[in-house]
């Protein structure tokens, strides 16, 4: 039996090729995701190990929960005291700032998306990891007119030593033009992973980022030989004043790396989800392929049964073929996964996450996961047709054609219906939980969608009969006898037809869902901007970060400006959401609808909160709100409760003064500009203020709405690109099914040619069969996609996405493309059928 199975496999190499390709693509996505994830983890771990000293002395609350620096610092007097501690080799103070952007020769900002733009003071303190940044060319900067850059940033910007480098700073002078005097890098290999690094001398960094105070953001303490990090930390701790802490370099590096890796972990999850989709779609192709091949081998298997082979042996022989196929597919997929990981590295480099300095990490888990996924998915998919074949008696298998009985399809229908009902229940629970932020809601939604898709796929041989019958009648009317034959061939084995269509159904269902989500999100943005937009212009950072507060002062002086409203945000510090701040003197300009309390009571030391948040937390006017800020936990009483407003999208609003006292840097996130009545050409005056600041833009209502829609468009395009993998597999499934069907019907094709059917008529018949399959999959996919999209948007209608918009034009394009897919998928199978030798085909058994 083992020998027979292997010979059968070798005898059908071409037929199994596209099934293998489905496994290859799915495994490649799994392997590529894991390799990229491991490379990302290794890179950040190595990076942070090179950016800490043996012991790091820092203020408690020196970093906000979102990873930015607070305004808390370490006084220089601490350094002098630490220098005399036994076991201390040297002590170095560090000044750091986010938002120091390098402007390239082309006038564009380097970086900005993702990895930070850092400004620091230069020192040559040794890193705990032993591979810190060092000057590799030039000299250290001295004075405000000199800087050093990391090599990668200088290369991207097009600067060499001696060039003048335009800089944008978060505070102080908005723009500087120092001279590049040095380049820094990792002599032993390493990378900043896309971050940009600008280095000043210590006095200049303190002047720019700490208002000239003799203070530091943190301090590195270097140990003498033979002194461990723990021993040095213990010796240092006793001398530190309240509010200052000491941690080992290893602890600081692990903490920073863990926070960042947790923040970017969604990348791996995101990619693995699409790997799963590809494998599910590929499973349909494998099931269909093995079903056809096993049916074609029915006589062969019947003879084996007649010679004494048991049902179990027949199943095992098919499973052996699947095992070999899975191993081959996993091996090729593993190799392709390495290339995919390299491609992901290049792709994410376009968004600022540059891992080019880090070699790819090929871990053991990647190999194990790839083979487990490839082999298990293939064997599981092949088990169903193998089990079904084992139930066929030797005498029954001698017949020319074997199809599922009506009772079998009816059983499949009821099982599929039960599966779909379970999926609906899971989907309802998950969508209800996601609104209430209950754990595992995402998994519930994913499982619900999968069960519904599988349920519909199981029911499709029954529910698709009216469609297939209508297609046969339409084709017969439009294309005559060839159209009638194509329709009858689709109806001959509805299970096979619908199984092939189901692969396309899954991809298009998800694509349609995302199309509706994207279109609804954009429509909701337009509506909220139209209803809630106040003022005449919005000023913001193109990277979504902070910008110099002096810009607001300059814009307030532009002719025609009546008022400027500042907004500042801090994310993830308050219940996982964040806090914002405005000036109480300008709060009336927001035109908030107050439901309780009075905005006149909003002052330093108090907050105003959104209505939905107040209801969720059970807050009334006067109740204290406990907030975790860099200076520690504090309580602010509620002065007023207002209706939710997208202009202030964070739930708790305090004053600018309290934000600064809480330990946050005084930098603005957005400005709303109010024009005086009759002011003309105000945009030109505002643009002039930021003419030399490419990171800050001025937008009217239409431009602001467009800016809010752009991330949605980008996200949907990425989703479509990833779903394209599933659609490619689905198209391969149609090609494979048609090709195997032609082989299965070789004798029938020969008879058609013998009675006068021309080659072009034969090609047209097979093309129509392909169109039926693809259109059926598209119709089912679009219907399910509309249902998923509408239900999903309805479930989150209270989360700011109030508009449900179905892009019927886009869905129509999907249906039109399905016809094109069907015609293209039929090219090779139709060509093969047309080229069959008539006499040999008739003689085929």
Task: Label the predicted regions.
Residues 391-407, 834-845:
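Short cytosolic juxtamembrane segments of multi-pass membrane proteins
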Residues 27-57, 291, 341-349, 430-449, ...:
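Alpha-helical transmembrane segments
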Residues 290, 323-354, 366-391, 422-434, ...:
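Small-residue-rich transmembrane alpha-helices
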Residues 66-70, 446, 450, 455-456, ...:
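Juxtamembrane segments of multi-pass membrane proteins
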Residues 2, 6, 11-19, 23-280, ...:
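Membrane transport/envelope proteins' first extracytoplasmic loop
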Residues 11-18, 266-269, 365, 369-381, ...:
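Alpha-helical transmembrane segments, especially those used as permease/efflux helices
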Residues 497, 501, 566, 668-674, ...:
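C-terminal transmembrane helical bundles of large multi-pass transporters
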